[in-house]
């Protein structure tokens, strides 16, 4: 048996799971919050519903990793560090260089560092997390699992922007797409649930959380996705605007006196359903306000759902049909209201969903279509950490790869 750590390092957080491979048994799941503060919070769940948490000063990610590994031994989850065979790290961006996960060496670290301009908020903490584990577990293989890798199969007609071609060749300006690890997991799982080879399926994956993206997956390969050069492109999100007329940036600079960076900050952090509703970036709050008659909340829900509705139609056309629509992530898995708004009116393309199955369906695998529906509709809770663990085993040749 092989124990793998799946890690997602944020600017002030460290999420992790410890999995036994190849059985894929979850041994522990944890979160360190407020890294860099005197009152950092460490929480871990393990065993049969057991939980441990502590508030303690943690000034660096290295200290957070040290505490994590110490607690794994203290709580008898592992007996020694030697039991950890590999560490898989979620990394935001792999550009065109990485179409698959990769064992991390000095060259890979330099390359990831060079991607910082494309992910200034995410890449530095990704690197910090890697360095912290390398320092404490120097002989354990570390694997980078890129959010963008799954979308490297997109054809040119879907990843190129209609800009001078040299912007692509000289500066790498193109659609990259994100949430690839999630889209990969749910589409593979959909094939298992449908009992059909992934190679034969045309799937539309809707990853709907505070960040949100749709992917068209044909034959197990991403052929199009809504996020672009950055995660700002695409559908309306919690605080991100999604796609809009780029001429708005100089217009708003002129009208508001803001810099380009300030306007982009508004589009990333003050827009989306938060900016539209003036209430919250959390769709649960907006659903409640809409139910109470708040007009801006209702319009926000309509815009959010309508954009997704439109992309489903576009991607069905691109793939010459669709076999299943998948809902995943916080909103996709848990909001029957949003799912209903998105699915309503898709009967013309063979989507017949059952309101009695949709209503109240939360956080569990479930088909919510009528049996006769040509297009299946499936809720699949995402499991990015499992993909990270599988890739770590496969790429580092730790045990026979997961089938």
Swiss-Prot record:
<feature type="binding site">
    <location>
        <position position="8"/>
    </location>
    <ligand>
        <name>Mg(2+)</name>
    </ligand>
</feature>
<dbReference type="Pfam" id="PF00871">
    <property type="entry name" value="Acetate_kinase"/>
</dbReference>
<comment type="similarity">
    <text>Belongs to the acetokinase family.</text>
</comment>
<dbReference type="InterPro" id="IPR023865">
    <property type="entry name" value="Aliphatic_acid_kinase_CS"/>
</dbReference>
<feature type="binding site">
    <location>
        <begin position="207"/>
        <end position="211"/>
    </location>
    <ligand>
        <name>ATP</name>
    </ligand>
</feature>
<keyword id="KW-0418">Kinase</keyword>
<comment type="function">
    <text>Catalyzes the formation of acetyl phosphate from acetate and ATP. Can also catalyze the reverse reaction.</text>
</comment>
<feature type="binding site">
    <location>
        <begin position="282"/>
        <end position="284"/>
    </location>
    <ligand>
        <name>ATP</name>
    </ligand>
</feature>
<keyword id="KW-0963">Cytoplasm</keyword>
<keyword id="KW-0547">Nucleotide-binding</keyword>
<dbReference type="InterPro" id="IPR043129">
    <property type="entry name" value="ATPase_NBD"/>
</dbReference>
<keyword id="KW-0460">Magnesium</keyword>
<feature type="site" description="Transition state stabilizer">
    <location>
        <position position="240"/>
    </location>
</feature>
<comment type="pathway">
    <text>Metabolic intermediate biosynthesis; acetyl-CoA biosynthesis; acetyl-CoA from acetate: step 1/2.</text>
</comment>
<keyword id="KW-0479">Metal-binding</keyword>
<keyword id="KW-0067">ATP-binding</keyword>
<dbReference type="GO" id="GO:0005737">
    <property type="term" value="C:cytoplasm"/>
</dbReference>
<dbReference type="GO" id="GO:0006083">
    <property type="term" value="P:acetate metabolic process"/>
</dbReference>
<dbReference type="GO" id="GO:0008776">
    <property type="term" value="F:acetate kinase activity"/>
</dbReference>
<protein>
    <recommendedName>
        <fullName>Acetate kinase</fullName>
        <ecNumber>2.7.2.1</ecNumber>
    </recommendedName>
</protein>
<feature type="site" description="Transition state stabilizer">
    <location>
        <position position="179"/>
    </location>
</feature>
<keyword id="KW-0808">Transferase</keyword>
<feature type="active site" description="Proton donor/acceptor">
    <location>
        <position position="147"/>
    </location>
</feature>
<comment type="subunit">
    <text>Homodimer.</text>
</comment>
<dbReference type="GO" id="GO:0005524">
    <property type="term" value="F:ATP binding"/>
</dbReference>
<feature type="binding site">
    <location>
        <position position="384"/>
    </location>
    <ligand>
        <name>Mg(2+)</name>
    </ligand>
</feature>
<dbReference type="InterPro" id="IPR004372">
    <property type="entry name" value="Ac/propionate_kinase"/>
</dbReference>
<dbReference type="GO" id="GO:0000287">
    <property type="term" value="F:magnesium ion binding"/>
</dbReference>
<feature type="binding site">
    <location>
        <position position="90"/>
    </location>
    <ligand>
        <name>substrate</name>
    </ligand>
</feature>
<feature type="binding site">
    <location>
        <begin position="330"/>
        <end position="334"/>
    </location>
    <ligand>
        <name>ATP</name>
    </ligand>
</feature>
<dbReference type="InterPro" id="IPR000890">
    <property type="entry name" value="Aliphatic_acid_kin_short-chain"/>
</dbReference>
<feature type="binding site">
    <location>
        <position position="15"/>
    </location>
    <ligand>
        <name>ATP</name>
    </ligand>
</feature>
<dbReference type="GO" id="GO:0006085">
    <property type="term" value="P:acetyl-CoA biosynthetic process"/>
</dbReference>
